[in-house]
Amino acid sequence: MKKGEANKPDKPTRDRALLSLQTYLSSARALTPLDYLKLHSGLFYCMWMCDRPLPQQSLASSLASLVLSLPKNKIVGFYRGFWEIMKKEWERIDVLRMEKFLLLVRRYVAVGLEVVRDNWTGEEEEENVGEGVLRVVEEIPCRVGEGEMRVPNGMKFHVVDIWVDELERVGMLEEDVVGTEEGKAKLERVLRPLRKMQKDSMNKIVRNKAKDALADERLPGNEKDANSDKDEDEDEAKDGWGGIED
């Protein structure tokens, strides 16, 4: 994609550039980790230069959707390249541009979860593309232990904050999904990055955010009992000030 094409007002120009990129990525040519980094550096610049909310939203969705158009043997490398560049560039994103990059990260989290939803088979081997995507998440935005401090906190916070939202968006919290053994196992694997962060992160804020995310009422087992709400209301009424009695 040529510099500036993502910022042109006409959508057809952006679409042609993205189609050309998709064709390139789908070719038989093998790409190296350096190729993916160069590619995502260019895509980062395109988003950086993209003005106005609607084009930004469209571009963020289009860039993330490239993942689903790739041959399976290129998905993990492409996904890793995105997170490596975001880790490298995050702290130079100014406040005026941050919102569109938060959206871009949200779209990439969602598409990564789609890959896991459709491809994770329970075999925790990196050759499995769903497992490979989850390992990228654990090694970069949700990293704990050695190297954790090199991951920008803002990026980490955002990923934790949106994780359950995007799980819900891609349908991984539907009752007919989590009601199966496969669905339960898949969800447990997808929640593992948060569990690791809650337990082992060196950053207290990260630990607390992960704890809050894992306590989300949308997750199985966290549903709030309607009777508990009633009991809380009654307790508050008892504790509340009832006015001055005559």
Language model feature labels by segment:
Residues K224-D246:
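Acidic, serine/threonine-rich intrinsically disordered low-complexity regions
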